[in-house]
Amino acid sequence: MSAGDPRVGSGSLDSFMFSIPLVALNVGVRRRLSLFLNPRTPVAADWTLLAEEMGFEYLEIRELETRPDPTRSLLDAWQGRSGASVGRLLELLALLDREDILKELKSRIEEDCQKYLGKQQNQESEKPLQVARVESSVPQTKELGGITTLDDPLGQTPELFDAFICYCPNDIEFVQEMIRQLEQTDYRLKLCVSDRDVLPGTCVWSIASELIEKRCRRMVVVVSDDYLQSKECDFQTKFALSLSPGVQQKRLIPIKYKAMKKDFPSILRFITICDYTNPCTKSWFWTRLAKALSLP
């Protein structure tokens, strides 16, 4: 096979690309993919066939059809699922005989992957040296050993929670209602609310990662128009999704508690939500949420 051969299969594709997550692809490549895949033509496989190969079901594809840029929404939704990678995307395009896409974009995709790897390597080199053997269930540094109000400062008995609450400051009143309904009732759940439970003075990103991954069994996302503008909430959501590819562990629970002017975030669109705005199901809202948070 010549170097310029656009056909890409599992045997010829650079193996490292299968370890590269889809987030490595920048906006330029995604726009070009949309230009190739959005048009519905009888002579070439479009985004709907790609969605089928990715494992999306009929109703999910029908919902994506309502999006202004279905290919972009498809990639956003797929990148949180198990098995999604740049290498797998190229493999599927080859399977669908979209050699035109591979011929034009493969070099740009490889460039994006190299940039992603370079950035990851730089981040790794900036990390402090750590002891090779670390118990994952217990924080081993002073910084992460006393981050909540009831923490053991020495990190021997870290405070644990049923759920981490991802929210914006403007949504704090609803979070307070969650506390009343879930903590101060017979449910007796323990929520991690940053403004109440996290001590000031440490890095918000490190704390969020520690709490979501090691201290909280699940994460509740309070979705609102303000949430969509929050970089902190965006980080927390994507971090939680990365811990449970394909949402197999039911780790993340989105909540919609008031009407929104903006579109619901695409990365959460395929996760069952708790809708507080639906008058027909509002009476069941807290029971459903409490049971979801009580699952082992």
Swiss-Prot record:
Residues 110-155 are annotated as: Intermediate domain. It comes from the Eukaryota. Homodimer. Also forms heterodimers with TIRAP. Binds to TLR2, TLR4, IRAK1, IRAK2 and IRAK4 via their respective TIR domains. Interacts with IL18R1. Interacts with BMX, IL1RL1, IKBKE and IRF7. Interacts with LRRFIP1 and LRRFIP2; this interaction positively regulates Toll-like receptor (TLR) signaling in response to agonist. Interacts with FLII. LRRFIP1 and LRRFIP2 compete with FLII for MYD88-binding. Interacts with IRF1. Upon IL1B treatment, forms a complex with PELI1, IRAK1, IRAK4 and TRAF6; this complex recruits MAP3K7/TAK1, TAB1 and TAB2 to mediate NF-kappa-B activation. PROSITE patterns: DEATH_DOMAIN, TIR. Induction: By interleukin-6. Ubiquitinated; undergoes 'Lys-63'-linked polyubiquitination. OTUD4 specifically hydrolyzes 'Lys-63'-linked polyubiquitinated MYD88. Deubiquitinated by USP3 that cleaves 'Lys-63'-linked ubiquitin chains leading to inhibition of MYD88-induced NF-kappa-B signaling. Residues 159-293 form the TIR domain. The keyword Transmembrane helix does not apply. GO terms for cellular component: cell surface; cytoplasm; cytosol; extrinsic component of cytoplasmic side of plasma membrane; nucleus; plasma membrane; protein-containing complex. The lineage of its organism: Eukaryota, Metazoa, Chordata, Craniata, Vertebrata. InterPro entries: DEATH-like_dom_sf, Death_dom, MyD88_Death, Myelin_different_resp_MyD88, TIR_dom, Toll_tir_struct_dom_sf. It comes from Mus musculus. One of its GO terms (molecular function) is Toll binding. Keywords: Cytoplasm, Immunity, Inflammatory response, Innate immunity, Nucleus, Phosphoprotein, Ubl conjugation. The intermediate domain (ID) is required for the phosphorylation and activation of IRAK. This is Myeloid differentiation primary response protein MyD88. It is found in: Cytoplasm; Nucleus. The keyword Ubl conjugation applies. Disruption phenotype: Mice appear normal, but display loss of activation of NF-kappa-B in response to IL-1 or IL-18. They show no increase in interferon gamma production or in stimulation of natural killer cell activity in response to IL-18. They are impaired in production of cytokines in response to IL-1. They have defects in pro-inflammatory gene expression and leukocyte recruitment after brain injury. Mice have a diminished capacity to kill L.monocytogenes in the lumen of the distal small intestine and express markedly diminished levels of REG3G. Residues 54-109 form the Death domain. GO terms for biological process: 3'-UTR-mediated mRNA stabilization; apoptotic process; cell surface receptor protein serine/threonine kinase signaling pathway; cell surface receptor signaling pathway; cellular response to lipopolysaccharide; cellular response to mechanical stimulus; cellular response to oxidised low-density lipoprotein particle stimulus; chromatin organization. Detected in bone marrow. Isoform 1 is expressed in testis, kidney, lung, ovary, adrenal gland, provstate, thymus and heart, and weakly in skeletal muscle, liver, spleen and brain. Isoform 2 is mainly expressed in the spleen and weakly in brain. CDD domains: Death_MyD88 (cd08312).
